[in-house]
Amino acid sequence: MTTPAPLTGLLPLNPEQLARLQAATTDLTPEQLAWVSGYFWGVLNPRSGAVAVTPVPERKMPRVTLISASQTGNARRVAEALRDDLLAANLNVTLVNAGDYKFKQIASEKLLVIVTSTQGEGEPPEEAVALHKFLFSKKAPKLENTAFAVFSLGDTSYEFFCQSGKDFDSKLAELGGERLLDRVDADVEYQAAASEWRARVVDVLKSRAPVAAPSQSVATGAVNDIHTSPYTKDAPLIATLSVNQKITGRNSEKDVRHIEIDLGDSGLRYQPGDALGVWYQNDPALVKELVELLWLKGDEPVTVDGKTLPLAEALEWHFELTVNTANIVENYATLTRSESLLPLVGDKAQLQHYAATTPIVDMVRFSPAQLDAQALIDLLRPLTPRLYSIASAQAEVESEVHITVGVVRYDIEGRARAGGASSFLADRVEEEGEVRVFIEHNDNFRLPANPETPVIMIGPGTGIAPFRSFMQQRAAEGVEGKNWLFFGNPHFTEDFLYQVEWQRYVKEGVLSRIDLAWSRDQKEKIYVQDKLREQGAELWRWINDGAHIYVCGDARRMAADVEKALLEVIAEFGGMDLESADEYLSELRVERRYQRDVY
């Protein structure tokens, strides 16, 4: 459970002032913070004449530096809960987002705790990429005086489960750090593991660190600490789906929907760059198929989080059915003694491949068995919400939120299958129907504070979504900064998402440049990374003029290919080798001039 962030209306500072104050005090020791506090007290309470001050005996209190490296918000919530636990224990703690951490100070850390998620092919979350690169570079310092602990969040449906946490843990040890605790790797259902780990961290730190006076306990963080809303992941807003429009052509191989959701008078606020969390209901037809394959009826009572529910209801609302994992396959094979699946158990690569290509219902179809209802429930993972990059700005749409949804559809031996959340939004929620949503704030994907700063946006496919939000915001504010969009998809006539809007922005001068890559409209495939290389000289001029670069879309292939192209452009037109170009791009990332929202 996290402690609610302070209501901005009750703070004497505005968000920008609060952010500057936090940035200015991040690196201060407790003694320095105490001095600054006394200094400001003296400014507010001037006295005439000399005042004798009795010095307070200096007390050395090792500070616990707590780094949150989050992609979807889960790692941040765990870190915030640990911060609250440490403060309650009167321990001196500084909480900082990985993107705000000045990693060159890591050599001076005495007590370091990292809570991290993993994205893509085992990569660190975006806000931790620079720190990760630094630790794995030749510049990384020895850490013989640092004691550390790592909590890693992941998803066993991915091959490189918790790889980011494994990387940080092994590298900190390799650099000479002392493990306070063994690393914990947590799956999607991480809450219980996180709660136990937090208690252990508090215990071990209390045994090592002198207790700080409560008045000297300090917690700092990024600007997202000031976000507050009565609607959260665990208490979502029941909103109304008002528009469901297919925005790909009749002959397109893709089914992409423009979804508009009415937030009513909820007061729910978001910024360009944020994501919308959507809770969904599994397809009742899929539930019926799975239940019948296991020779069950659906009305069998099962226990879910201490409550008794009918099996069908539990499957529809509480468990993941459309994403299989290696753990589920292994457990099902062991439980049923399946002759076809047991040989996979000893082969990690084959097991992972099978899970990635065979939905749960088809695993049961191909390897039938009879399970009781509770055994089935115990086999599955809890349902989790899906996050979609927001494609609108409230400066234009007010009490609405828009998202761009690529509907997942495929066949398994002639049987139609679909993604859980995307098909729920596209096929099963009627217009004016209810949908449970919340805002996942993303302060690592924000427009420049200076409206005159040029912006380069790279977003193929549904990665276009946040840039629609960006342009709505910049158009509404009438900003003068230049905007350049790189977009790509298979076909111009079928897959040009929001075509009329982009053309209008070009005509109005809001969008300064647009480069389009259609991969299937000619013999040679052309992608956005090819357009980046083609426009390399002009791209470098924009970067030299202070442009911010944004990338959104597929993490597995596109993001890596785009980064490679950017490095080549920087090396060629910046007159440097690839290693120097990589350092240059890392500096842009640290300066928040290179931001990615990849998934």
From Swiss-Prot:
Q: How is the cofactor bound?
A: Binds 1 FAD per subunit. Binds 1 FMN per subunit.
Q: Please name every pair of cysteines joined by a disulfide bond in this record.
A: none
* Record pathway: Sulfur metabolism; hydrogen sulfide biosynthesis; hydrogen sulfide from sulfite (NADPH route): step 1/1
Q: Where does NADP(+) bind?
A: S519, R520, K525, I526, Y527, V528, Q529, D561
Q: Per its record, what are the GO molecular function terms?
A: flavin adenine dinucleotide binding; FMN binding; oxidoreductase activity; sulfite reductase (NADPH) activity
Where in this chain does the record put each Flavodoxin-like domain? 64-202
Q: Which UniProt keywords apply?
A: Amino-acid biosynthesis, Cysteine biosynthesis, Electron transport, FAD, Flavoprotein, FMN, NADP, Oxidoreductase, Transport
| GO cellular component terms, A-Z | cytosol
Q: Which residues form the FAD-binding FR-type domain?
A: 234-448
According to its UniProt record, the EC number is 1.8.1.2
Q: Which cofactor does it need?
A: FAD; FMN
| Reactions it catalyzes | hydrogen sulfide + 3 NADP(+) + 3 H2O = sulfite + 3 NADPH + 4 H(+)
Instruction: Name the residues that bind FAD.
Output: 322, 356, 386-389, 404-406, 410, 419-422, 599
Annotated NCBIfam families = cysJ (TIGR01931), PRK10953.1 (NF008197)
* Sequence similarity: Belongs to the NADPH-dependent sulphite reductase flavoprotein subunit CysJ family. In the N-terminal section; belongs to the flavodoxin family.
Its biological purpose: Component of the sulfite reductase complex that catalyzes the 6-electron reduction of sulfite to sulfide. This is one of several activities required for the biosynthesis of L-cysteine from sulfate. The flavoprotein component catalyzes the electron flow from NADPH -> FAD -> FMN to the hemoprotein component.
Q: How does it assemble?
A: Alpha(8)-beta(8). The alpha component is a flavoprotein, the beta component is a hemoprotein.
PANTHER family linked to this entry: NADPH OXIDOREDUCTASE A, NITRIC OXIDE SYNTHASE-RELATED
State the protein's name.
Answer: Sulfite reductase [NADPH] flavoprotein alpha-component
- What organism is the protein native to? Salmonella typhimurium (strain LT2 / SGSC1412 / ATCC 700720)
Q: What is the lineage of its organism?
A: Bacteria, Pseudomonadati, Pseudomonadota, Gammaproteobacteria, Enterobacterales
